[in-house]
Amino acid sequence: MKEIAARGIVEGAAAGPALIGDEAISFLGDVDIATGQIVGDLPSVRNASVRGTVLIFPYTRGSAGAWRFLYQLYKHGNHPVAIITDSAPDPSVVQGAILAKIPILCEPTTAVRGLIATGTRVAVEVTGDKGVIRIEGTG
């Protein structure tokens, strides 16, 4: 098992298969709330489901309403269990993650997206501003 330190944004712990995207993701328009399926123009993950995954993306694109879409994914049971980004996430996404109890980590000390593939089992833990990413193996 490999451990990587990261900056913690939203506290919590979760584990699941990684869903790795090469583009920025917006919960406002890129993800279908009713199904959790990625429907936006994201070629690396188009038609994949975010449900139960640890999302690993370069960054998030948000808007004033993005928090509501992430929270609605949670209410429908179609939410990711955690989010890891290369850079700080959009504030609206952070707001939605707080409401939905989805841990967020950013700025990992090692580039996670280049290290693992979609489907690899990943666990995260965030306490305060400290985060740990544990790469557990294939899911």
Where are these regions (language model features)?
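Feature captures the catalytic cores and cofactor-binding loops of soluble hydro-lyases/lyases
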Residues: 3-12, 19-132
